[in-house]
Amino acid sequence: MGEDTDTRKINHSFLRDHSYVTEADIISTVEFNHTGELLATGDKGGRVVIFQREPESKNAPHSQGEYDVYSTFQSHEPEFDYLKSLEIEEKINKIKWLPQQNAAHSLLSTNDKTIKLWKITERDKRPEGYNLKDEEGKLKDLSTVTSLQVPVLKPMDLMVEVSPRRIFANGHTYHINSISVNSDCETYMSADDLRINLWHLAVTDRSFNIVDIKPANMEDLTEVITASEFHPHHCNLFVYSSSKGSLRLCDMRAAALCDKHSKLFEEPEDPSNRSFFSEIISSVSDVKFSHSGRYMLTRDYLTVKVWDLNMEARPIETYQVHDYLRSKLCSLYENDCIFDKFECAWNGSDSVIMTGAYNNFFRMFDRNTKRDVTLEASRESSKPRAVLKPRRVCVGGKRRRDDISVDSLDFTKKILHTAWHPAENIIAIAATNNLYIFQDKVNSDVH
């Protein structure tokens, strides 16, 4: 598949760059809410930053799609497990928004062990004119109260309040790698290396174990759970991926403990490509249902694959993300990069998929035209409202002027976390400790 150098379809203009300095500020998750008006990021310091989309202004047409900081709060603190003598990092592993049901917004955030439910509310009015209290809230001297008055609401500067509503703890022995909210809007699941639990959003003291792959003897362990997600429309269906590259679709109507999957999606290994690294690079790092619910998107180290729920034998589409790294797997193993967990994302119409790579590159694949493009998210190449130019990695041979050699790639600059606006061509890219937001100015609607 050749790279598409036609920039008309991928004319993403850079909107905003929020740069930070320390290790704690490295972004560890990015998530749009269901309308795309809010964007949440979590970092290694346990903080959650919420950005809100600016309303479109007639005076400033370029402001459409820009996001400003809406609220920042500390979600998790570092803890210590005294029974196991283990430190529990404050790093936010995942954020998931709940569908909005009233004026408030709600989201779930999790670190390795504890999931928290947060409520985000706005206040732009305050009551004034109490009979028994003064403006500072102190009780008045009753002898000075000579008349009754009706308290009134007076406008005030907008205040965003974030409050913890629930804390879901003690549900996991191993590190939580994913959470997913069910379409019934009442339950969600959380997955660690060996188990998946089902929680009710209103109940914090118990959860139901729906998948348990822990063997009686841990020496017999051959695979771990890497990601899981509920089906977007059928509340009884969910999928989980494994370190062996397989996907298991489970139906909660079949049994309380879904140890027996309904469908197993697995691609037979090509014996000619077998190597020491085969199992490592086949491990699925992310799985996402399409918005339609018909397909699943998975990411392993070198590829992204699209699976049809009706065909278990093999993926219907396979896209090479950075196949030029296949010859460098040995050095990538030595520096631990081979264990990096890249995420993937669908656009709103399920026609384009996106995933990250090294050197601050990210890749887009158009499923209809079969075109693909490599773009770069970096402070050097991205200035506000500039058009992103396609990049090309060269493996030996002739090089064009803007090509970059595979030997020049910076493996410390990696894009692991990406998100796509649910209805528009706006994408959020986390590049280490910088957040980039790009918008397609040519095609403002999802094609």
Curated annotation (Swiss-Prot):
Highly expressed in brain. Keywords: Repeat, WD repeat. GO terms for molecular function: protein phosphatase regulator activity. GO terms for cellular component: protein phosphatase type 2A complex. The keyword Repeat applies. WD repeats lie at residues 22-61, 87-128, 171-209, 220-260, 279-317, 334-375, 410-446. It comes from the Eukaryota. The keyword Repeat applies. The B regulatory subunit might modulate substrate selectivity and catalytic activity, and might also direct the localization of the catalytic enzyme to a particular subcellular compartment. Belongs to the phosphatase 2A regulatory subunit B family. PP2A consists of a common heterodimeric core enzyme, composed of a 36 kDa catalytic subunit (subunit C) and a 65 kDa constant regulatory subunit (PR65 or subunit A), that associates with a variety of regulatory subunits. Proteins that associate with the core dimer include three families of regulatory subunits B (the R2/B/PR55/B55, R3/B''/PR72/PR130/PR59 and R5/B'/B56 families), the 48 kDa variable regulatory subunit, viral proteins, and cell signaling molecules. Interacts with IER5. This is Serine/threonine-protein phosphatase 2A 55 kDa regulatory subunit B gamma isoform. The gene is PPP2R2C.
